[in-house]
């Protein structure tokens, strides 16, 4: 399974960056984007709920959910990310609340229907070849009324557009261009487009927000600036 996953360039890229992923998540920009995403949950009581972190990386956000009382299963296609997640979970969070598994893709989730009260999918869908198939799987494993907390690249972000231009220009002169992740990050959308896509898969958008840039929150959370759209949605009955 791990060998098959490593055949895909986006997985090899995430394997390569796994050793520095946790450090990156502790940066001011990443802490701000995580806070903006979790703000959509507000003070919701998650104690005792079962959540899936679909594309968990090194488990940073899985541990935040576990700290709120969730039993969290984190899955990722990158073997190195999962190895790091397993090695870093002893941080005060009860170990029994965290399970990490390497799987080939979130387009085929190895869980029964209606298994989870919530699904977290943070900056993952842009790297998968079939977003619709992944959303169908997320819908399948969510219980009716269950929540999806998801972030995807903001198509309307002027800052993201400038990143893409810089990536394209630097790719012509360097084997390690600026914003390397953009070589693998393909999917982006507007809030309206995501609302329609979610609706097609039995999910109702409840709230949205913007984040992801290194700029102060007053700018970062503007629709034309934030490089990510954060979305809270609910599975219909």
Predicted regions and their residues:
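Class I SAM-dependent methyltransferase SAM/SAH-binding core
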Residues: 58-107
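Conserved class I S-adenosyl-L-methionine
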Residues: 1-46, 48-57, 60, 64, 92, 149-172, ...
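Acceptor-substrate binding/catalytic loop of class I
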Residues: 177-193
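A short glycine-rich, Lys/Arg-flanked "PGG" loop and its adjoining helix->strand segment in the class I
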Residues: 132-144
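A conserved beta-strand element that flanks and buttresses the S-adenosyl-L-methionine
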Residues: 120
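Short conserved loop adjoining the S-adenosyl-L-methionine
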Residues: 108-113
């Amino acid at each position: 399974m791990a060998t098959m996953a490593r055949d895909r360039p986006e997985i090899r890229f995430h394997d390569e960056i796994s050793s520095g992923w946790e450090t990156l998540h502790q940066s001011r920009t990443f802490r701000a984007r995580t806070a903006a995403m979790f703000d959509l949950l507000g003070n919701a009581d998650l104690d005792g709920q079962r959540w899936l972190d679909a594309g968990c990386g090194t488990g940073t956000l899985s541990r935040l959910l576990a700290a709120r009382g969730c039993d969290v299963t984190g899955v990722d296609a990158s073997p190195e990310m999962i190895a790091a997640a397993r090695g870093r979970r002893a941080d005060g969070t009860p170990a029994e609340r965290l399970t990490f598994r390497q799987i080939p893709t979130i387009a085929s989730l190895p869980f029964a229907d209606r298994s989870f009260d919530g699904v977290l999918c943070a900056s993952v869908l842009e790297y998968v070849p079939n977003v619709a198939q992944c959303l169908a799987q997320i819908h399948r494993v969510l219980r009716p009324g269950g929540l999806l907390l998801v972030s995807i690249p903001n198509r309307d972000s002027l800052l993201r557009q400038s990143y893409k231009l810089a990536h394209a220009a630097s790719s012509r002169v360097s084997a390690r261009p600026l914003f390397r992740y953009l070589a693998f990050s393909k999917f982006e959308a507007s809030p309206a487009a995501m609302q329609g896509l979610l609706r097609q898969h039995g999910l109702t958008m409840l709230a949205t927000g913007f984040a992801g840039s290194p700029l102060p929150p007053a700018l970062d959370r503007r629709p034309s600036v934030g490089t990510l759209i954060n979305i809270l949605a609910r599975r219909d009955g």
